[in-house]
């Protein structure tokens, strides 16, 4: 009957395959198990783990194929201008999935590239489903509906802050 039960947070990728036929488009869905109330949107980024964590190809690790720079004296993969294919979902606090599309994932930032979690950007491109923008009003006070790139930042420029700094 094709039904299944989700009892914890999980991401699934579905596709249809039949010998002698072209495969279907892959469909990705993240299921957030509502064991608590969420007050912020949820960003789901799904890809083959090799794209992020492989020492040779991964953009999210120090790795072995990188370059120096951005405060690093040893080569780091996260310094490379590499794009990796990912599926991006934006889920509202109410549980509504308002964006679900394939995009490119790339590292961003300067010195903050070395700090985890790393900052990254999601870039729309016609190569994926013919969509060259991400369409959603992410910022209620801005008139923008279409975005070519979204940056997810780690607050790296604030890593040196201390409670005392704010109190002075």
Task: Describe the predicted segments one by one.
Residues 1-168:
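Phosphate-handling architecture centered on phosphoinositide signaling
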């Amino acid at each position: 009957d094709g039904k299944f039960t989700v009892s914890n947070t999980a991401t699934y990728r579905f596709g249809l395959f039949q010998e002698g036929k072209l495969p279907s488009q892959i469909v990705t869905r993240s299921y957030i198990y509502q064991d608590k109330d969420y007050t912020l949107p949820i960003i789901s980024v799904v890809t083959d783990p090799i794209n992020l964590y492989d020492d040779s190809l991964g953009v999210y690790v120090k790795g072995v194929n990188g370059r120096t720079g951005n405060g690093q004296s040893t080569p780091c993969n996260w310094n490379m201008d590499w794009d990796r294919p990912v599926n991006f979902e934006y889920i509202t606090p109410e549980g509504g999935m308002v964006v679900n599309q394939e995009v490119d994932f790339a590292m961003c930032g300067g010195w903050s590239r070395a700090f985890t979690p790393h900052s990254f950007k999601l870039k729309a491109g016609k190569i994926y489903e013919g969509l060259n923008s991400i369409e959603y009003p992410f910022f209620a006070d801005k008139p923008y509906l279409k975005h070519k790139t979204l940056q997810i930042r780690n607050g790296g420029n604030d890593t040196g802050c201390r409670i005392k700094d704010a109190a002075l």
